[in-house]
Amino acid sequence: VAVGDVRDSLAAFGERYLRKVFTAGEVSDCNGRNRVHSLAARFAAKEAVIKAFAEPDMPFPLREIEVTLDGPLPQLRLSGTVAERARHQGWVSSSLSLSHAECHAMAVVLVVCRQADSE
């Protein structure tokens, strides 16, 4: 994700952009020195989650994909229709890695699914 795109969205839409894309917890966690970079990394995580689904072209409410900092490593918290889709596809657990540089932020999501029943 281009950090400049997130910066431009914040400049153009402000709080409306934040409320549409991020949870209150994510916004609070990003209120530091590298705010735009941290928000861009969370946006990258949301994109990575969507791509991990077998049907990534379906609509996904971005606020139902949350990056939390409950411990030393970032975690994913899914809710609503996104959590239901994950259960339907057999998601058992996930791991998340975030990083950012001057111009870009990136995320990798690894999902473990239960083994499909053989017929």
Regions found by a protein language model. Name each.
Residues 1-119:
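Core catalytic alpha/beta fold that binds nucleotide/phospho-ligands
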